[in-house]
Amino acid sequence: MSISEKPLSELLRPKDFEDFVGQDHIFGNKGILRRTLKTGNMFSSILYGPPGSGKTSVFSLLKRYFNGEVVYLSSTVHGVSEIKNVLKRGEQLRKYGKKLLLFLDEIHRLNKNQQMVLVSHVERGDIVLVATTTENPSFVIVPALLSRCRILYFKKLSDEDLMKILKKATEVLNIDLEESVEKAIVRHSEGDARKLLNTLEIVHQAFKNKRVTLEDLETLLGNVSGYTKESHYDFASAFIKSMRGSDPNAAVYYLVKMIEMGEDPRFIARRMIIFASEDVGLADPNALHIAVSTSIAVEHVGLPECLMNLVECAVYLSLAPKSNSVYLAMKKVQELPVEDVPLFLRNPVTEEMKKRGYGEGYLYPHDFGGFVKTNYLPEKLKNEVIFQPKRVGFEEELFERLRKLWPEKYGGESMAEVRKELEYKGKKIRIVKGDITREEVDAIVNAANEYLKHGGGVAGAIVRAGGSVIQEESDRIVQERGRVPTGEAVVTSAGKLKAKYVIHTVGPVWRGGSHGEDELLYKAVYNALLRAHELKLKSISMPAISTGIFGFPKERAVGIFSKAIRDFIDQHPDTTLEEIRICNIDEETTKIFEEKFSV
């Protein structure tokens, strides 16, 4: 065969370490393969990585550097009989102190019984086995063989790596490509050097003696330029946010389009595993199982069929109840200092440790009905509440368990923790950390929107805890009166809540501060108090209206709350209201009001 007749992938196949592009952790100066082969030795190993990442090219290095006989077999071409012949050859050579290395391409094509033939020969040292696979070794290689081999992970080649290979190839082919064509071919190759070289060969054969334009390339290969790195992140972001927004229609659209434009399905599967914990969490613990199972299915099935697995998972995650309580617990711990572990929780491994008090006083919960009431946190952190479940899905059940186990942290019948108490003209004003839906007051305030649609945030929690009657009464108000203007407040019953009424007040959406937001927030607070006064109530609890998803700056809101409450009391000295509570469940908002609020 002449040079011109050889495939481009063969012409450019690396012959020495310096010829390899990418995989520096393997072929670089400090790479494990380079250091080993330079001594003439090699260990049994599995070369695992995506197509076109350089695995098969290792054979040329083995032939050059390995101090022994090297045999190449492909599992797609050669059967067990040929493998057994090589194993016998290795057994004979070992008797004479010589070595044989079997390079077995695509070992995942062998079934488990065929793979077991290799085990004893690798164990005895009859052969050194170097096998390649594009499939996860944990799934496709029998444990007995896998335990006797080291896995070398080949990474997907970067765009920069592929561009270097492309430049070499265009010199060999003497082909002239526009820069946009080079970039498009690199993107089209998806980290696969073999795919890149095959594409270049097709282009060369179709457009000899011509400068190749992007239009030429797309005529030959179709759309190869549509999915840039920027659009990769844009589509991925839209996909995640659509699932977070519980919209399966949008989520499936972005998912399928990403795959059509060449996205790696494993990337999407990984993102869904993260999403299952970060955005669904313990509201539906099954979400993580489904996401992990989907990732395994993607590895086993591959495209195009695994797209169905991905779509199924995306729909499930989109419709699952949402909670970020796990994520928030993680973030809270990351902000806390490192403290010493209490002595009673330390394991007394030695007598000296016992003398120092390690393990002293520890009570084994299983000997006490499954639960021992004690402080397990470091002493300085004993009052911290790290995990705060949302009142949604399975976390509702977890919350009830926590209330029974740790009433001092999760409130028993009430979650309220009074952080600050003030008095103004005989009226009590309290800054409280807790769940407003459990407040034992005459009325709680809901931070509502103009159409009284109580879907998320505090509004959603109030409806879930109080029942559908709250939303039904709200809908009737809007049907009879129209939308509720920003700054105004209306009243419904409280359903199953401990409070008698819910006062729905509409706070402003923050738009920079130049659209009357301060005045509207003042009115929202004032009118909520006014509705309670009109009903001759004695106590009211309200959240930090507009400071959540409406984005009103919290520190700015404190002063407005203070003025509205003070003005209301001044202007209604005969009010029946005796207690005004500002209740928030999150620590940040509570702390800001605790530190800044004054009358």
Curated annotation (Swiss-Prot):
Coiled coil: none annotated. It comes from the Bacteria. Residues 416-599 form the Macro domain. One of its GO terms (biological process) is DNA synthesis involved in DNA repair. Signal peptide: none annotated. SUPFAM superfamilies: Macro domain-like, P-loop containing nucleoside triphosphate hydrolases, post-AAA+ oligomerization domain-like. GO terms for molecular function: ATP binding; ATP hydrolysis activity; DNA binding; enzyme activator activity; four-way junction helicase activity; single-stranded DNA helicase activity. PANTHER family: ATPASE WRNIP1 (PTHR13779:SF7), WERNER HELICASE-INTERACTING PROTEIN 1 FAMILY MEMBER (PTHR13779). In the N-terminal section; belongs to the AAA ATPase family. RarA/MGS1/WRNIP1 subfamily. This is Uncharacterized protein TM_0508. The lineage of its organism: Bacteria, Thermotogati, Thermotogota, Thermotogae, Thermotogales.
